[in-house]
From Swiss-Prot:
Catalyzes the condensation of pantoate with beta-alanine in an ATP-dependent reaction via a pantoyl-adenylate intermediate. It comes from Shewanella sp. (strain MR-4). This is Pantothenate synthetase. Pfam families: Pantoate_ligase. Homodimer.
């Protein structure tokens, strides 16, 4: 696997592949890779001739008092895992390469509406940071296809909307959430959990599953939400949000809506965990 921090190196290699008529897949990450990331790379390798991965802890998407400095950086282990999974080109830029004028002077991309609710309301500016870095990475790598995890459901919709609105010629593929044996969605932030918290963490998925089951049986959204919040609090969580939304617009769920998604974010100790479930009523 070729590794470089330099934009020109990435473009040169991708151009060489394109000159051969070969296809390129892209998986953007912030590193500290787990099996969920590796699954994205393996799926990318099945779909395209070559796989490019980026590792960049993006300062633009972290708010004040968030864990930018504490975010784990494990480049050596990540490189080994990526090589084994079939990645051929790894882009590891520094903030100075990505944002040479600094964040305050950086042109940014903002996806209106869908960026402002749920995680966007809890973390103002987060999705502006996500959309900007993903758009910038797309312009550097120029992939045919890009892969993202369905675990970050709102992020995936923000990126799909950006690609559509800006007419970017890139196919976006969402890959099912990879879970630990307990049902806990894999996340780099799971490393913040104590053993006791890790034992309690599967309650998040159980609460979401119970909500979906209740809605399918005709129980009101208000009732299933209150019951789920109570179960999370009893398990030691501090809920941030727990909501039922339209699956493609993230508008509040209406009685006539069939395609729904439950989205949850909750604190367990130091870790902010998110999860979701898309289902038909």
């Amino acid at each position: 696997m070729i590794t470089s921090a330099h934009i020109d190196d990435i473009r040169t290699q991708v151009r060489a592949w394109r000159a051969q008529g070969e296809t390129v897949a892209f998986v953007p990450t912030m590193g500290n890779l787990h099996q969920g990331h590796i699954t994205l790379v393996k799926e990318a390798a099945k779909k395209c001739d070559h796989v490019v991965v980026s590792i960049f802890v993006n300062p633009m998407q972290f708010g004040q008092n968030e864990d930018l400095d504490a975010y784990p950086r494990t480049l050596e282990a990540d490189s080994q895992a990526l090589t084994a999974a079939g990645a051929e080109l790894l882009f590891t830029p520094t903030p100075a390469i990505i944002y040479p004028k600094g964040l305050a002077q950086q042109t940014y991309v903002e996806v209106p509406g869908i960026s402002d609710v749920l995680c966007g309301a809890s973390r103002p500016g987060h999705f502006r940071g996500v959309a900007t870095i993903v758009c910038k990475l797309f312009n550097i790598v120029l992939p045919d296809v890009a892969f993202f995890g369905n675990k970050d459901y709102q992020q995936l919709l923000v990126i799909r909307t950006m690609v559509e609105d800006l007419s970017l010629p890139i196919e976006i593929i969402g890959v099912d959430t990879i879970r630990e044996a307990s049902g806990l969605a894999m996340s780099s932030r799971n490393g913040y959990l104590t053993e006791e918290e890790k034992a309690a963490a599967p309650a998040l998925k159980k609460a979401i599953d119970a909500m979906a089951q209740g809605i399918k049986q005709g129980v009101s959204i208000e009732q299933v939400t209150e019951e789920a919040k109570a179960s999370l609090i009893a398990a030691g969580f501090t809920p941030d949000y727990l909501e039922v939304r339209h699956a493609t617009t993230l508008a509040n769920a209406e009685p006539q809506d069939q395609a729904l998604v439950i989205l949850a974010a909750a604190y367990l100790g130091k870790a902010r965990l998110i999860d979701n479930l898309r289902f038909d009523r």
